[in-house]
């Protein structure tokens, strides 16, 4: 990160922001860009000019990259900066923005409508939620807009329907071993994307966009997925990736996003991933120059204090017996797999069940997944169809205790004496977190404390919901997961309704792109495979706009598979740092642990 910032400082010494251009941004009265956002716009202009032959320095190579990756810390304003730059640099064709359905509402309300005057800009939201007759949209229609905003799902549907991704494939030669196999996936050519007669969402693939901006670009960072293939089929003269975490799991994460931007130095993920060649190419091709990284310190901005509480919970009684039984069974399956008696996929499924069991055995006991051995071991957990046994789990009880301890003192739905509730909250917080936590906390009643709870399992959130309803009925909350239809309304309720203090979210839906600074507490029910997801989740509330101290509660089952996952995450952090922080002292590449047979065996203690 330091190397990239030094290069940017050198760049800004001979390139200056055009004040006249900035004055034409048409921001609403009272709003202006931060200095670091102006620097990003300067850098974007430099990168787009760099691809033009007349502006290219002698001997300077771009390796095909036309744009780059904007990796600002969450909350530094990637959305506003991207919008401002696109409005400032209009061209004959519009700019296309691709984001998730959940975050699309944020682009509309917290981006376009909040900062820009509608009289000066035109934005089309290409989604059925915003356009009833979306199938009638034509190229001529979208040409009247400055920016078109759509979602990854819309792109996926349109691309698969038209098979546009096939134009990106390089197939093996007839006489080679790779005959009829995909050798490489390239960006689609302009001549293939200039299809003026297409209608509906297909216009995404029939328009040579001036620029394409992919928000939360780590969503397509796995080159094996259909999403990656469909995004590669979107043509843009310039391409930009917006992400707070460009590397999450593997070295190919950064490669896939650079390939979308046009990188041609290494065209196959296999070559990038082989024996540390990716890091070598990254440095030799000076790809750090195509990535703008910035922290809050770099931006000279400060945030309120953030306190992380790592809480361990012990399994006891029948829950412990069930967990150990499934652990033993998973180890047995692993040994069979090593002798080719069962598949890796089956063992991986057992591993997921083990993770669920660490939270509550109830999570792994739907009728379709039960077997006779589980029925015998799980007894009341298996027979319980409504979660009554599940809410007795140590972790669920601890989370309910945390929620009560930080919200009871100012719950607007309670009729109890506020002073007694305040003492109760202090007493409970002391039992949970200790005296140091009490000393650092302000328990004075002001605005009701709001709390966000994250989990990777929807069934876990369902279980927590039942526990809250039984043990803390006055606590009002909303839950948003993959099946939730009215997400925007529920987010607005959490943010604006003083009586709604809780928001239960799956990581997949809520860990990216949302601004939820109304909350000051965050609970992570279980560890994810990478800390980047946790950091994204925490950044929903610990970001620009937050004025209060933030508390994060990580709940881990002691001696369980969860502790092993935390260790795996550390290795991934080191790998990401070896790329983005420019650590020249690293003589050999730092390899991220993969979820393969070796890693799985290590986590199982084999």
Curated annotation (Swiss-Prot):
Span of domain Helicase ATP-binding: 59-264
EC class name: hydrolase
UniProt entry keywords in alphabetical sequence: ATP-binding, Helicase, Hydrolase, Nucleotide-binding
Gene Ontology MF, one: ATP binding
SMART domains: DEXDc, HELICc
InterPro entries cross-referenced by the UniProt entry: Helicase_ATP-bd (IPR014001), Helicase_C-like (IPR001650), P-loop_NTPase (IPR027417), SNF2-like_sf (IPR038718), SNF2/RAD54-like_C (IPR049730), SNF2_N (IPR000330), SNF2_RAD54_helicase_TF (IPR050628)
Residue numbers binding ATP: 72-79
Pfam families hit by this protein: Helicase_C, SNF2-rel_dom
Enzyme nomenclature, EC number: 3.6.4.-
One GO biological process term: DNA repair
Family: Belongs to the SNF2/RAD54 helicase family.
Name assigned to this protein: Putative helicase 172L
Annotated organism of origin: Invertebrate iridescent virus 6 (IIV-6)
